[in-house]
């Protein structure tokens, strides 16, 4: 417990909020190369095979990123764009791959929320 005099001299130190997407180094997105593409199972109440990729970013950090949407064309050495955003039922997955940019194709036959999955508007 500091004395009044110590507080006058030094003051209190502000708490620093922990950055949730440290690997992006303050950028909205980062480019990276897939080093491994695989499936993993989610936490307890859920059951599925979630598609994830291990990505080496341009910031020299290797992260695990989720591949959203149904079906994908990613394989090892694919160039991808990674954004922040965790997947609640996959521990350690704090990034998502942006569909429809670089080597990642958009989701086929997507009608709603197309911009999130890089799907072009179909001609009617």
Swiss-Prot record:
UniProt name for this protein: Small ribosomal subunit protein uS12
GO terms assigned for molecular function: rRNA binding; structural constituent of ribosome; tRNA binding
GO cellular component, one term: small ribosomal subunit
Biased composition (Basic residues): 108-118
Keyword list, A-Z: Methylation, Ribonucleoprotein, Ribosomal protein, RNA-binding, rRNA-binding, tRNA-binding
Annotated NCBIfam families: rpsL_bact (TIGR00981)
Role of this protein: With S4 and S5 plays an important role in translational accuracy.
Positions of modified residues (3-methylthioaspartic acid): 89
GO biological process: one example: translation
Ribosomal protein as UniProt keyword: yes
InterPro entries on file: NA-bd_OB-fold, Ribosomal_uS12, Ribosomal_uS12_bac
Gene: rpsL
Organism placement in taxonomy: Bacteria, Bacillati, Actinomycetota, Actinomycetes, Mycobacteriales
Oligomeric and partner information: Part of the 30S ribosomal subunit. Contacts proteins S8 and S17. May interact with IF1 in the 30S initiation complex.
Residue span of region Disordered: 105-124
PANTHER family found in the cross-reference section: 30S RIBOSOMAL PROTEIN S12 FAMILY MEMBER
HAMAP family reported in the protein's UniProt record: Ribosomal_uS12_B (MF_00403_B)
Family the entry assigns: Belongs to the universal ribosomal protein uS12 family.
């Amino acid at each position: 417990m500091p004395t009044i005099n110590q507080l006058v001299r030094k003051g209190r130190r502000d708490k620093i909020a922990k950055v949730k997407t440290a690997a992006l180094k303050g950028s909205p997105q980062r480019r990276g190369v897939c080093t491994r593409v695989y499936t993993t199972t989610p936490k307890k109440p859920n059951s599925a095979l979630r598609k994830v990729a291990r990505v080496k970013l341009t910031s020299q950090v290797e992260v695990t990123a989720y591949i959203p949407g149904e079906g994908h064309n990613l394989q090892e050495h694919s160039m991808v764009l990674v954004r922040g955003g965790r997947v609640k039922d996959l521990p350690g997955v704090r990034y998502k791959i942006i569909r429809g940019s670089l080597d990642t194709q958009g989701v086929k036959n997507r009608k709603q929320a197309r911009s999130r999955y890089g799907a072009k508007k179909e001609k009617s």
